[in-house]
Amino acid sequence: MAQGNIKVMGAQNNQVVEQYMTQAKAFVYAACEDFGIALVEAQACGTPVIAYGGGGALETVIDIRQDQDQGTGIFFFPQTHQALAETVETFSRFQHQIRPESCRNQAAKFTPKVFETSYLAFLEQCYQDFTKTVR
């Protein structure tokens, strides 16, 4: 099934996942989810992402072809194995432009603390808007 450069490992603890993720050339994600925490976790390890360009990936990954300075990965379209294979080839031409620190900086935008701060600011704004209409 898997070739010599692919290792199917099954469930692993966080330490093993982090070790492999940090050493990976890229994290491939072909699913379409609303958020997809695995994309953020890969970037937190400094690992570029090759992802289907739909769903939450569009918010969490920056395509290197769109932003040469802050790119954190590359998208493929449509969601087919042919498009994925072509994008893996394309990634090989761009991979050295993607900096681990850019990946980590992008992941830092999705920490629980950032979410909490944003959510509280949103609630405060809603409250302020509400109190203006009540008076």
Located regions from the model:
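Short glycine/acidic-rich beta->alpha loop that forms part of the nucleotide-sugar donor binding site
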Residues: 34-37, 43, 53
